[in-house]
Amino acid sequence: MIHYRTIDSPIGPLTLAGHGSVLTNLRMLEQTYEPSRTHWTPDPGAFSGAVDQLNAYFAGELTEFDVELDLRGTDFQQRVWKALLTIPYGETRSYGEIADQIGAPGAARAVGLANGHNPIAIIVPCHRVIGASGKLTGYGGGINRKRALLELEKSRAPADLTLFD
């Protein structure tokens, strides 16, 4: 049985779903990837830890999530999603860089497709992947949401530390 809960956020409603405290989906309203909702049961108290972390993220107080995830997909998708988890807050990578990182040079388009099927948006930060030219391309939640998430992170990313001025 999958339990779900919808919360408000600065980028619109977010639906969290999973079993127990394990998150299997986090999606935005009108997101292109739509998981099957067969056997989903509403639970307004579910995923309170993840909700608290999302609220802290949007407030600029959290840069790394600590949520138990159940990511299901093909082997290639799994490799892409794990690579996304290594992109630091406030930084971006190109689709080609992710392809190279997972040992699949030339597979930038396939990385884009895997990004499009990321079941746990924001926490698995597919919004941090951009075109090789630096252009914002493709995002299941819409380019405006991608831009908003990147701007949030850029505005709150920790400054580089230096020992000497």
Swiss-Prot record:
The gene is ogt. It catalyses: a 6-O-methyl-2'-deoxyguanosine in DNA + L-cysteinyl-[protein] = S-methyl-L-cysteinyl-[protein] + a 2'-deoxyguanosine in DNA; a 4-O-methyl-thymidine in DNA + L-cysteinyl-[protein] = a thymidine in DNA + S-methyl-L-cysteinyl-[protein]. GO terms for cellular component: cytoplasm; plasma membrane. GO terms for molecular function: methylated-DNA-[protein]-cysteine S-methyltransferase activity. Belongs to the MGMT family. This enzyme catalyzes only one turnover and therefore is not strictly catalytic. According to one definition, an enzyme is a biocatalyst that acts repeatedly and over many reaction cycles. GO terms for biological process: DNA alkylation repair; methylation; response to nitrosative stress. Its EC number is 2.1.1.63. It comes from the Bacteria. This is Methylated-DNA--protein-cysteine methyltransferase. It is found in: Cytoplasm. Keywords: Cytoplasm, DNA damage, DNA repair, Methyltransferase, Transferase. The keyword Methyltransferase applies. Pfam families: DNA_binding_1, Methyltransf_1N. It comes from Mycobacterium tuberculosis (strain ATCC 25618 / H37Rv). The active site is at C126 (nucleophile). Its main location: cytoplasm. The keyword Transit peptide does not apply. Involved in the cellular defense against the biological effects of O6-methylguanine (O6-MeG) and O4-methylthymine (O4-MeT) in DNA. Repairs the methylated nucleobase in DNA by stoichiometrically transferring the methyl group to a cysteine residue in the enzyme. This is a suicide reaction: the enzyme is irreversibly inactivated.
